[in-house]
């Protein structure tokens, strides 16, 4: 990504280095400059969409969830239309981001899914628009439901309690 930011993209590029570092990528993972990548069966009925550090967490979560796949966004603006189309095929879509709810990438995806006319249920989990006190990364992820256990619980709970 840094190479592309310096030598390829002509405009401004933001690179985020999260506090606490990045987790180890899964075996066989290689960044291939595509705007997104699908992990798991894209025909599954549930889809987790994320980017950044939470990708590893979501990937771990699908190990405990049935019939679920992950879309990892490598580029968050603009969201690739193919990523929107892939998510729209699922019956339930959960977007997890380590950013604020308002103006976040999840809101953008929700708008794009609405424009597409998807009938899938959409859930957006992010940090509320409030002051976040200093604490360890792990405790904050738990507090805001962005850890593996919370993700697994939320997805399973939604399945048990359909709208």
Where does each model-flagged region fall?
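Internal gly/pro-rich beta-alpha loop/helix module
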Residues: 1-6
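Thiamine diphosphate
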Residues: 7-163
